[in-house]
Amino acid sequence: SGTTGFPKGVVLTHHNLLNNALAAAKAMKFTRWDKLAVPIPFYHCFGMVVSNLMCFSVGATVVIPGEYFRPEEVLFAIESEKCTAVHGVPTMFVAELEHKDFHNFDLNSLRTGIMAGAPCPPVLLERVMNEMHDREILIGYGQTESSPLAHLTKKDDTFDRRVNSIGTNVPHTEVKIVDPGLGVTMPFGEVGEICFRGYHVMKGYYNNEEATRQAIDENGWLHSGDLGTMDSD
């Protein structure tokens, strides 16, 4: 919402947000002993829910590198605070890896994190895992309308699965692939629109009933507007 059209306010509930944050924490095996570097803006659902609220839900530490994103501040925060995780969009990880002083920072404390917001090229994931020592980093997919996480890879997933898929839907939710024109469910491997249903679906668009009806059908399915395929597993 807002990327390709006029921005719409998304109404999310406490139930939406807290459960989505807990889903992220469980996927990352996060505990009160972990520390997360958060360079993502707090006004974005990724930073607000999947980062801050996720830490609050398990008592983990939120480390704020700076007022806005500077790669050197993120690297310094990870080293100085011994962060066990870092979140970001792919371009943030690229900026960190390409920083002229990257190899002067000790990032061995890193264990996990989430990369989301755009597709992750295989070479980038490989560098994050090997050069940043972030071996358990997860790939996430979603949108503000789904609180925001809808899909997430697992820490034990193979490299191929992490770069060639968006993982499985988060627990206690449903997903299906439908023909955008006919609305029928597509077979495994066939391209269609990704639809979600579950606790994470927004209450609706703020003061916009027409847009809400277009996004959420009578059976509670949120139509993402994105195309994808579903594997048998």
Predicted regions and their residues:
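Conserved AMP-binding A3 loop
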Residues: 1-19
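Conserved G/P- and acidic residue-centered "switch" motifs that form tight phosphate/ATP-binding loops
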Residues: 2-3, 59, 117, 142, ...
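Short beta-strand->loop structural element characteristic of the AMP-binding/adenylate-forming
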Residues: 8-11, 38, 61-68, 138
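Conserved AMP-binding/adenylation subdomain of ANL enzymes
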Residues: 18-35, 45-85, 99
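Phosphate-coordination loops involved in phosphoryl transfer and adenosine-cofactor binding
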Residues: 32-33, 110, 218-219
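Gly/Ser/Thr-rich phosphate-binding loop
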Residues: 60, 80-88, 97-161, 174, ...
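Short hydrophobic/charged patches on amphipathic alpha-helices used for structural packing
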Residues: 71-75, 94, 102, 213
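Conserved ATP-binding/catalytic segment of the ANL
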Residues: 184-189, 193-233
